């Protein structure tokens, strides 16, 4: 049987400008499929799956083939604990060069004083930020006060007292229902809540937006050591100048998690007081989402925290992933281009267009709209849960995720809302006309979902139904959009058998 690569090259024969990256990508799939068929098949099936649905999960995107190829090489074999030119292992010169270039690119892209590119994820980056703050603001002064040079010099009793002192300090962050993230400290099941006394701030019940006066009041009351700002499900921008002033008034560290909107900062959409870099003491982010890179994290910090963060090993990390760091470097370089800036602005334009068409058709959006890349639909008036909407939309080829809303009466599993984002559809090249069509498809589906009737004649709270004629129409409309805006068009799916 002819290989995938042979079929691809036969089909491409005579075509001008044959893309080297797509050839290399297909060659890798070809090898994997023949050497480890079950794994290769699953990878190809995922590619087919992603090409057959509209990806509207706000935290997902599509990395370029160049980014993906940068991860698939022998860099994965190298141990390199430490930081560039200060490793705990020998023969790290090439990894040093890659990590140094990646960090310098991050500093250039964001205008940051320092950049640490090793975190494996946004959660790792957030944990490192918290540990760096604890080390700088609590542990360091305590060790100095006791007359020691390092924490290892403390007696067992003194160390126990220090841990108790750390636990008494307050971290103030956005609650989960108000759009915060698990790693912002307000979810007790998460390790972050176990490091300090973590307290939440909420959005205003009427406006569903963060109330800076209320945050300032809470800061004056609780005198936190750390003020966390950022979000995973909030459709407006933040004023980091105001948040910095609030933090400074009580001597708190301002830590911003910009995982969701880093690409909008890099692309010049969020500027001045909406850009956290000039104001925050520490900024964390993922490298996927709006940055379109590999799954990973970054920490951007002021000089005060640079030394501590670059000692992430042994603070809370072991060996980094040099192959992923190489992919981060590629993605960050892509984000320096003019095309990326155009992309970032289009992401927000598309989100606003989507929101406008939802509202015209009577759907309620949290905060009344969007200023960024996402929007949250309140499904309460439709009588269905976020879980049901997520499942039904998935069945017709649209990927969204269920999401809690403030004062959610349904609960954190089923939820009363769904979150939608435009980063991935914008990467495919879709614009305002396509957003109108997407909105029309979603509204028609949501308005025709009914609750499934149980055997006892009651209605299910977790399962819904969609009339087959509506489902077929929606699938056809989704397929039409995807046929005009295919994922990785340079990869011919006809060869992927």
Swiss-Prot record:
| EC top class, as a word | transferase
- As stated in the Swiss-Prot or TrEMBL entry, residues carrying the post-translational modification N6-(pyridoxal phosphate)lysine are 289
Q: Quick one: which pathway? A: One-carbon metabolism; tetrahydrofolate interconversion; Amino-acid biosynthesis; glycine biosynthesis; glycine from L-serine: step 1/1
Catalysed reaction(s)? (6R)-5,10-methylene-5,6,7,8-tetrahydrofolate + glycine + H2O = (6S)-5,6,7,8-tetrahydrofolate + L-serine
The compartments listed are: Cytoplasm
The GO terms describing molecular function are: glycine hydroxymethyltransferase activity; pyridoxal phosphate binding
What job does this protein perform?
Catalyzes the reversible interconversion of serine and glycine with tetrahydrofolate (THF) serving as the one-carbon carrier. This reaction serves as the major source of one-carbon groups required for the biosynthesis of purines, thymidylate, methionine, and other important biomolecules. Also exhibits THF-independent aldolase activity toward beta-hydroxyamino acids, producing glycine and aldehydes, via a retro-aldol mechanism.
The text of the family note is:
Belongs to the SHMT family.
Q: Which PANTHER family match?
A: SERINE HYDROXYMETHYLTRANSFERASE, SERINE HYDROXYMETHYLTRANSFERASE 1
- Describe its assembly: Homodimer.
Q: Which HAMAP family match?
A: SHMT
- Under which name does UniProt file this protein? Serine hydroxymethyltransferase
- Organism, per UniProt? Chlamydia caviae (strain ATCC VR-813 / DSM 19441 / 03DC25 / GPIC) (Chlamydophila caviae)
């Amino acid at each position: 049987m002819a290989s995938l690569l042979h079929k691809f090259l036969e089909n491409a024969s005579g075509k001008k400008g044959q893309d080297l990256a797509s050839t290399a990508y297909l060659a890798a799939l070809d090898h994997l499929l023949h050497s480890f068929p079950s794994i290769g098949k699953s990878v190809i099936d995922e590619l087919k799956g992603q090409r057959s649905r509209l990806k509207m999960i706000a935290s997902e995107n599509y990395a370029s083939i160049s980014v993906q190829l940068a991860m698939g090489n022998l860099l994965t074999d190298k141990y390199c604990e430490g930081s560039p030119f200060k490793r705990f292992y020998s023969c790290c010169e090439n990894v040093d060069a890659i990590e140094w270039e990646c960090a310098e690119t991050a500093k250039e892209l964001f205008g940051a004083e320092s950049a640490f590119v090793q975190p494996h994820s946004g959660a790792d980056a957030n944990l490192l930020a918290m540990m760096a703050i604890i080390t700088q603001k609590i542990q360091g002064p305590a060790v100095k006060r006791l007359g020691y040079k390092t924490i290892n010099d403390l007696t067992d009793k003194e160390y126990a007292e220090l841990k108790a002192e750390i636990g008494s300090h307050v971290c103030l962050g956005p609650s989960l229902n108000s759009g915060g993230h698990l790693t912002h400290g307000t979810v007790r099941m998460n390790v972050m809540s176990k490091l300090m006394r973590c307290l939440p701030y909420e959005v205003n019940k009427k406006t569903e937006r963060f109330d800076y006066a209320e945050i300032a009041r809470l800061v004056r009351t609780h005198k936190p050591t750390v003020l966390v700002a950022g979000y995973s499900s909030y459709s407006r921008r933040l004023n980091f100048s105001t948040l910095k002033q609030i933090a400074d008034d009580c001597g708190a560290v301002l830590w911003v998690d910009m995982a969701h909107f880093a690409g909008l900062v890099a692309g010049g959409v969020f500027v001045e007081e909406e850009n956290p870099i000039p104001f925050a003491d520490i900024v964390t982010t993922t490298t996927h989402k709006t940055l379109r890179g590999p799954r990973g994290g970054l920490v951007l910090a002021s000089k005060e925290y640079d030394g501590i963060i670059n000692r992430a090993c042994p603070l809370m990390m072991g060996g980094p992933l040099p192959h992923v760091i190489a992919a981060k470097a590629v993605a960050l370089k892509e984000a320096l281009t003019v095309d990326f800036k155009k992309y970032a602005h289009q992401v927000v334009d598309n989100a606003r267009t989507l929101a406008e068409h939802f509202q015209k058709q009577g759907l309620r959006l949290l905060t009344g709209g969007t200023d960024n890349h996402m929007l949250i639909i309140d499904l309460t008036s439709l009588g269905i849960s976020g879980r049901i909407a997520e499942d039904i939309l998935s069945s017709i080829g649209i990927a969204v995720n269920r999401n809690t809303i403030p004062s959610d009466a349904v609960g954190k599993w089923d939820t009363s809302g769904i979150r939608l984002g435009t980063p991935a559809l914008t990467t495919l090249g879709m614009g305002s006309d396509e957003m109108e069509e997407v909105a029309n498809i979603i509204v028609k589906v949501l308005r025709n979902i009914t609750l499934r009737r149980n055997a006892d004649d009651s209605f299910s709270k977790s399962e819904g139904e969609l009339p087959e004629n509506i489902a077929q129409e929606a699938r056809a409309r989704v397929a039409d959009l995807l046929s005009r805006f295919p994922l990785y068009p340079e990869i011919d799916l006809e060869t992927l058998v």
